[in-house]
Regions:
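Sequence/structural signature of beta-propeller domains
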Residues: 1-193
Length: 193
């Protein structure tokens, strides 16, 4: 994820077995690819899910691969293994070295495991990638709960797609092999206005 001030957010947020106690997001200055050899971590954000009552959790619902930045806050979308839901959590405070609770915002059945997400430049749209479909959520107001607004969707067939981002009126998707796919936002099917 990136913010408006040239920072790159790197998530060490994977938790396949739901046993991790050290979920971390690193903030660095976004390096210039041809000139930067080494970069320093500006901040480390340690967090936990308050609704994960035991480690490991009996339901494997605390893994994550997707996150985005919006208006000074970091959002993480979970990748459930016990069901096909995702949950959006928000991290409000970025005090380095202090473990902070992630605040649960909303829950939605994506009918698959979430592998990527991005927020549009105007912050009104959230695109969510699963292994079998693309979801587009649009808020009606300045809300954190994208799942209550307009929803569009599109199934796809490509192997192990792991990342998605907005590029104007298009979406760019990449899989584990490095293949890039391009899709017009208008091609998604509206399922709720």
């Amino acid at each position: 994820a990136t913010d408006d001030n040239g920072h790159l957010y790197i998530g060490d947020i994977g938790n396949n077995s739901n046993t991790r106690r050290d979920l971390m997001i690193y903030i660095i200055e976004e390096p210039f690819p041809t000139q930067t050899v080494v970069t320093n971590t500006k901040k480390r954000i340690s967090y936990y899910y308050p609704d994960q009552k035991e480690i490991p959790a009996k339901k494997f619902n605390f893994d994550a691969e997707a996150m985005f930045w919006k208006d000074g806050k970091i959002y993480v979308l979970t990748k459930h293994r016990a069901d096909t839901y995702t949950q959006i959590y928000r991290l409000d405070a970025f005090n380095s070295g202090e473990k902070r609770p992630a605040r649960l915002i909303a829950r939605f059945n994506t009918r698959g495991q979430v592998s990527g997400a991005d927020v549009s430049p105007d912050r009104r749209k959230l695109v969510v990638l699963t292994y079998t479909s693309i979801w587009l959520f649009e808020t009606r107001k300045k809300s954190d709960n994208y799942f209550k607004g307009k929803i569009s969707w599109l199934p796809y067939k490509a192997e192990h797609c792991e990342a998605i981002c907005f590029d104007g009126k298009e979406l760019i998707i990449v899989n584990e092999r490095g293949d890039l796919f391009q899709l017009k936002v208008e091609d998604l099917i509206s399922i709720r206005e």
